[in-house]
Amino acid sequence: KVLLNQMPIAIKNSKIDITQEESTKELATNFAYYLKGGEIIFLYGEMGVGKTTFVRYLINEFQKKEKIPLTEVTSPTFNLLNEYRLNNLIIKHYDLFRLKHELEIKDLDIFENSKSSVTLIEWPQLINKEKLIKTIDLSFVYENELNNRTVKIKGLS
């Protein structure tokens, strides 16, 4: 279990078992209390490994904190972006699965980031991260012949 008071330690570099969906929810809940705005979270991993599930729990936890009704959170595969406006925070959820070239990313204004937003990006492989700050990488992985799932956390850079 990742405890709230351990979150900054977990952010540095750790691998967490999320085989049980409840563990994914707990991790997302902890992240919701850690993130303040301005962060960019890159979500890596195969289809179905838990990226969107993590995002759903994270956004719903932000909504609970702000006492906003929970909304359905789906992957923005076709429209590329779903935005969730909370009281003082905007969560931008991108899914870049369909993009094939780095040039397509420039039109999305992904990095028009501010301290009032948290940006979540699924399938970020085409992004050049060199000049970005406040990034967190979440790498979701199947293990033991697809029976288990883990997430490796790396950041803040």
Task: For the regions a language model picked out, list residue spans one by one.
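P-loop (Walker A) phosphate-binding loop of NTP-binding proteins
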Residues: 46
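Hydrophobic anchor at the beta1->P-loop junction of P-loop NTPases
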Residues: 41-43
